[in-house]
């Protein structure tokens, strides 16, 4: 996607509404956003109003890639550090 933030890389470790909204705006402006989710069901917002992948979740997480990492494990932490190294500060 092209935009004013094209070439910017963002690693998003947020849930529910406000964090994903910020990531959505960055992605809409062209940033490459990777949403990090836990392996125990991911972002609780996925299940908002009882569904899976409801309209709100899809809207707030559009234009993003998702990566599932278990941040309780050493391997998950290493993967996060590796992913973060490629992100902009």
Where are these regions (language model features)?
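N-terminal helix-loop segment corresponding to the beta1-alpha1 unit
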Residues: 1-84
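A short, hydrophobic C-terminal helix/tail in secreted or cell-surface proteins
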Residues: 85-89
